[in-house]
Amino acid sequence: MEDYIAALADFGKTMGLPELAPDEKGYCCLQFDKKNTVHLQYQPEEDQLIIFIQLDFVDSDHQLSVYQMLLEGNFFNADNNGATLSVQPGNDAVFLTQMIVKERLTFAFEKTLENFMNAVDYWSAKIDEANNLDEGKDVDEGEDEMEGVSENESFFKA
C-alpha cells in the first residue's frame, strides 16, 4: 500500500492537492470536471489498485445495441485503454474498471489515470449516443477517437 500512498501523494501535488491520501482501508475518490467521480480502492490481498467509475445506465429500449457495443469495446480492450466495461446486475449501470498492479503504481500511475479518464469521456459519449438513438438506427460508426491510441499514449482533450 505504500506505493499507492506515494503515487497518490505525488498525483495530489501535481493537481494542487498536497494532502491527497487514501483512507485507512485504501479508498479514495477523485472528481474530474465536476462531473466524473472516479473511485480508487487498494486491494492488499492482490497488491493492486482497482479504479472504477459508473458511466451511465443502459436505457431499456436500447439494451441490445448498447450491450453489443460494450462487448465489442471489451474485445482485446480495443476501445478502452486496458480498462473493462461491465453492467451491474439488477440496475443496468455501466461501469468502467481498471486494475493496476503494484509495479505500475510506481512509474505510471498518473499516465494510467489519464488514459482511464480518456476512456471515460469516450464511453460516456458513446453510451449517451446509443441511449438516445431512434429505434432501428445504429450507433455512429464514424471516426473512432480511440483508434490508434495505445495504453501508453494519451490524448487529453482541453
Name each model feature, range by range.
Residues 28, 47-49, 92-94:
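Hydrophobic residues embedded in beta-strands of well-ordered beta-sheets
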Residues 1-38:
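Charge-rich, low-complexity N-terminal segments
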Residues 83-114, 121-140:
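Well-ordered alpha/beta subsegment
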Residues 39-42, 46-57:
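A short acidic-to-branched-hydrophobic micro-motif
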Residues 33, 44-46, 89:
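A generic beta-sheet turn/junction motif
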Residues 11-14, 69-77, 112-126:
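Conserved short hydrophobic interaction patches
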Residues 54-90:
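Short, internal acidic amphipathic alpha-helical interface segments
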Residues 128-158:
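Short, highly charged C-terminal tails/helix-capping segments
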